[in-house]
Every structure is written in structure tokens, then in C-alpha cells.
Regions:
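N-terminal secretory signal peptides
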Residues: 1-24, 45-51
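Flavin (FAD/FMN) cofactor-binding and adjacent substrate-gating region
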Residues: 28, 162-232, 237-238, 244-250
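N-terminal Rossmann-like FAD-binding beta1-loop-alpha1 element of flavoenzymes
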Residues: 67-92
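Short hydrophobic core segments
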Residues: 71, 262-272
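Active-site substrate-recognition segment that forms the wall
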Residues: 82-86, 150-155, 271-422
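Glycine-rich FAD pyrophosphate-binding loop
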Residues: 86-105
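Dinucleotide-binding Rossmann-like beta1-alpha1 core, especially the glycine-rich loop
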Residues: 110-195
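C-terminal catalytic lobe of FAD-dependent flavoproteins
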Residues: 384-480
Length: 480
């Protein structure tokens, strides 16, 4: 804890803190959508009592006060720190490698942002609504800050989903879009071919196009958010932090490797795949940290068909990708792979036995140690996607590969909740491979919870630390 109690350590209005008015994200997440997310009829009064344990931050001159340490300068941590500072809170942001570093979940060049969440088994309505709000915010962030930082942060590419026949994912996505008034087009394969002849879609019965979807600069956006936070008065510290002991209902001061202690009124851990290392007993069996791989292929010399704005981001079964972006033209991005064709066998030939299980390399479950290279068979699988859908790129040179851990919780929802037994310490994250997309609005939501604003109690309930756990004997070897 800090030397003085929370209510006695106000931070006065500071001209360095942004005077932007509070945004309306929480109002958008109303009780109706909260009920959908929670998936059950819950007593709001009970939830409110649970969610407001501990003292909220006292307000002075209409602004919050106190000191918060945010651990993790990834997408969620950066926007949480920025929004806390905009509320008037003193903020210290800590990261062991730096904002947007290559080990982080959002340290890649780009991320797609779309609202097609018909494949979600829970909370699909809310995810669509929040994704639409995120798209608006990314556009506004780009318009406001691109000139200063000398780079675009968001490109409205549109997103096209192609399937050979209707699937629950495509049917439900179209239903959700219709119900929420989302702009989209349902095209025939012939119409798609006329619009994007470089994208082979013959034989597809389902072509859904979301024109407002886009692609964001991931690493650049995280680093820009941290720069804006520092301009507003957030202090940044580089170093590895250890959680403080939990005693008497609160977490005590954090400590760096050199023994230096960092005390505050509240602590917010936005640590992505590092959660199982920081809180092993709490998070080891409540989340998984698979590794996702992507390839960036060179676009042909003198051929702009595979560059923005000439082709949208795209979604085929098991694989997503998008065009090369200006001005660096890092490459045409492919995430996922097609399996090689099965070998031919005689009609009476027995199928081969399944391959023997490969022991899990423990380094793959440690974001500090995990190798991020992509095996050749994975690259070959991504190239098979090009051969089928983008034949002009079938032999394109490989510019680079990227790999990062992402997080999946046992209940497939984000986690925004207090650490058990510590009224002043929070876990915020576990992004379900979608965390960057939502970070620009979730940073505001997390900040509001930390300063004591509950918002919709049903949403708060849905984002609680799950009580279910993964089977500890189940191998944690997911990757894609």
C-alpha cells in the first residue's frame, strides 16, 4: 500500500492531464446487453455490492484522485493508463521490455478489426456492439493522432467472409448485423469476383462483406498510446515487477528485481500471457496461452492489386489475412494454414496410425523464453492458402514471419476483476485473441472500474475471474 490512505492522497487538477470529456462506452454497454453477456438473470443489487468492495477513488473538482500502478504496457495497459490519467489519477506504468515489444501479444505490425462474431457461443450480441464502437474509436484515434506520429493507425479496408456453404458462423453473423443495424452486403461469388478478381471465390455460396471493418497498426498504436499517456503525466518505468503480498484485504507494495519497492493505492495487472507466471496458483488453470503464427508475403513488383485499398481483409475457413499497407508495404498477411492433401491409398489399404504425441517443450508456455520462429511446414500451409485463393501470389517471396502468444480463458470472456483477497489489486486482460481490437474501449472500462464506477453490474459479473478451471492434466499445446 502507499504511505497514505487512498482517500487522503488526492491528485489535484493538473493541466497536463487531458481535459477530454468522458466517453460514452459504458452507457453503450447497457443493462440489456449486460444481461446477454452474463447469460443469466442476476440480482443487480447483489452484484453491485460485490463489485464495489473496497473504497472507490474520491473525486475532487469532478476528477478522481489517488495513485495507480499499471503493470504491462501492452494494448490494454497503455489505454488503461491513459484513461486513468484522463480521470485525474496519478499513474505509473511499468513494463519489463517496453511498450509494443516483440514478445507481447500486440507487438506485431498489424491487427484486423471487424465485428463478425457469430461464432461466439456466449455474449455474441455484446461483442458485436463493442466491436462496432471499437471501430469508431480507432477511426477517431487515427484522425486525431496520425499527423503527429507520422503514421496511419487505422485503415478502412472492409472485410469479406467467404464460405462454400452456409455455416452457423456466417448465418448468425448476418443475423446479428441485421439486428444491430450494421452495414454489410451479401454478395454472390460472381459479384465478389467482379469486385476483387485477384481473390478466387468460385463455388462460394456465402460472401459477406463488412465495409467498415479495417486493419490497425498494432505496435505503432501501443507505442503512441503510451506516448500520449506520458504527455498527460503518466510516469513510465522499465523493469520486471513482482506482485506484493496480500495481507489484511489489500496488496502491499510491488517490488522490482533490484529490491526497489513501488507503492500505490491500487494496482492493475494487464499482463497478457505473463499472468500464469505472475499468479500461478490463480491463473495457471484458468487460461491458456497458445502461439499464433502469421506470414507476410511480398506483393508483386508493379502490381498494386494486393495492397490497400485494392483488396479487403478476408476470412476463409480457418485462415484470415489482409492487404499490404502503405507506406512500408510489409507484406500481404496470412494467418493460418491449409493442411496438405492426404496421400493416395488403395481402397483396401489401412490408414496410417496416428502420429506419436510430441512432448511439449516447456519453453513454449513461457512468453519470456518461447521461440517465435515458424516451421517450414507452417509456411507451406500458408502458401497453400495463396495457391487456392490468391494464385498470383502462389510463388511470392516470404518477407517475414511473426508469432505471438495470445490468451484464452476457460469461459471465453475477458477478465476484469479484483484479485481474491485484495480490494486494491486488479487483473485485466485475457483477450481471447481479440484483445487488441477492443483495447481502445476496454481501457476506459477498466479505468472506470478501478476508480469505483461499476457500470452495468451484469457486465461486471460476466468479466469476473472464472471459477471453472481447465483440466490440469490436459496438455497445453495449442498453437495455430
Amino acid at each position: 500500500m502507499s504511505d497514505s490512505p487512498l482517500s487522503d492522497s488526492p491528485v489535484d487538477r493538473d493541466p497536463a492531464a487531458s481535459e477530454l470529456p468522458r466517453r460514452d462506452f459504458l452507457r453503450m454497454a447497457g443493462v440489456g446487453t449486460g444481461a446477454l453477456l452474463a447469460g443469466a438473470a442476476l440480482d443487480p443489487a447483489t452484484l453491485a455490492a460485490q463489485a464495489t468492495q473496497g473504497r472507490p477513488f474520491r473525486r475532487r473538482f469532478g476528477r478522481a484522485s489517488g495513485h495507480v500502478v499499471v503493470v504491462g504496457a501492452g494494448a490494454w495497459g497503455a489505454f488503461t493508463a491513459l484513461n486513468l490519467r484522463r480521470e485525474g489519477v496519478k499513474v505509473t506504468l511499468v513494463d519489463q521490455y517496453g511498450p509494443g515489444n516483440s514478445r507481447s501479444t500486440s507487438g506485431d505490425e498489424t491487427r484486423g478489426i471487424r465485428s463478425s462474431y457469430g461464432d461466439r457461443t456466449v455474449s455474441a450480441e455484446l461483442w458485436v456492439a463493442w466491436a462496432r464502437k471499437s471501430i469508431e474509436r480507432w477511426r477517431a484515434f487515427d484522425a486525431e493522432h496520425a499527423k503527429r506520429f507520422g503514421t496511419r493507425f487505422f485503415y478502412t479496408t472492409g472485410d469479406v467472409i467467404i464460405r462454400e456453404k452456409p455455416e452457423p458462423f456466417t448465418t448468425r453473423t448476418a443475423e446479428l448485423w441485421t439486428a444491430q443495424g450494421v452495414r454489410f452486403e451479401s454478395l454472390t461469388a460472381a459479384e465478389a469476383t467482379r469486385r476483387w478478381p485477384q481473390f478466387v471465390s468460385e463455388g462460394s455460396q456465402v460472401v459477406l462483406y463488412e465495409p467498415d471493418a479495417g486493419v490497425a497498426r498494432a505496435r505503432d498504436s501501443v507505442q503512441a498510446a503510451v506516448a500520449l499517456a506520458r504527455d498527460a503525466g503518466v510516469e513510465f518505468k522499465l523493469g520486471r515487477i513482482r506482485p506484493g503480498a496480500v495481507a489484511g484485504g489489500t496488496m502491499e507494495a510491488l517490488s522490482f528485481d533490484d529490491g526497489t519497492r513501488l507503492a500505490a493505492d491500487a494496482y492493475v495487472f494487464c499482463c497478457g500471457p505473463w499472468f500464469p507466471k505472475l499468479f500461478p496458483s490463480l491463473m495457471q488453470t484458468r487460461m491458456r496461452i497458445p502461439i499464433g503464427h502469421v506470414c507476410y508475403f511480398a506483393t508483386p513488383e508493379g502490381d498494386a492489386r494486393f495492397q490497400f485499398p485494392n483488396i479487403p481483409s478476408w476470412n476463409v475457413p480457418g485462415v484470415t489475412g489482409w492487404p499490404a499497407l502503405p507506406v512500408d508495404n510489409h507484406g500481404f498477411r496470412v494467418r493460418g494454414a491449409f493442411a496438405p492433401p492426404a496421400p493416395l491409398r488403395a481402397a483396401d489399404e489401412e490408414p496410417p496410425p496416428p502420429p506419436a504425441p510430441v512432448p511439449v517443450d516447456p519453453r513454449t508456455q513461457d512468453p519470456d523464453l518461447s521461440p517465435r520462429w515458424s516451421a517450414q511446414e507452417r509456411i507451406d500451409g500458408s502458401r497453400r492458402v495463396l495457391q487456392k485463393h490468391f494464385p498470383a501470389l502462389a510463388e511470392a517471396p516470404l518477407n517475414s514471419t511473426r508469432a505471438c502468444h495470445y490468451e484464452s480463458s476457460v469461459n471465453r470472456n475477458f477478465i476484469v476483476d479484483r484479485i481474491p483477497g485484495a480490494s486494491n489489486a486488479w487483473i485485466a486482460g485475457v483477450g481471447q485473441a481479440e484483445g487488441f481490437k477492443f483495447s481502445i474501449v476496454m481501457g476506459e472500462y477498466v479505468a472506470s472500474r478501478v476508480i469505483g464506477e461499476l457500470g452495468d453490474p451484469l457486465v461486471a459479473e460476466a468479466f469476473k475471474l472464472p471459477t471453472a478451471e481447465y483440466d490440469p492434466n490436459q496438455p497445453n499445446r495449442w498453437d495455430d
